[in-house]
């Protein structure tokens, strides 16, 4: 089986990673000359990855969130995101606001590590498509 992921932003890259882990051959297509450009732009203001509050309180921030949103967040809660980042060699910390940040406040090392992992998993990339 082969999957095409359209868009190389965080959602597309995570989709590619999940599919590749499941044994699917993946190609990521993006119209830009490199992946993760908006991710890098978001980091200019100090990228917060998630929030450290407990899951029910976090979900409460979404009001009457659709059941699908609840299932998605429960499947990949904030602690799992922190573990994922740390497995990429990018430790995190909780700021005074409760938000979780990369320890060095930079997105580029996180993105490079993520792209390296995807490459090692066999994910193919087609840019300017």
Which residues does each predicted region cover?
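Glycine-rich FAD pyrophosphate-binding loop
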Residues: 4, 20-44
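Glycine-rich active-site loop/strand segments that organize a redox cofactor
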Residues: 46-94
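Short, hinge-like loop/turn segments at secondary-structure boundaries
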Residues: 43-48, 111-112
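Feature captures the FAD/FMN-dependent oxidoreductase FAD-binding
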Residues: 74-129
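Glycine-rich NAD(P) Rossmann-fold beta1-alpha1 loop
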Residues: 9
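N-terminal Rossmann-fold NAD(P) dinucleotide-binding loop
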Residues: 12-13
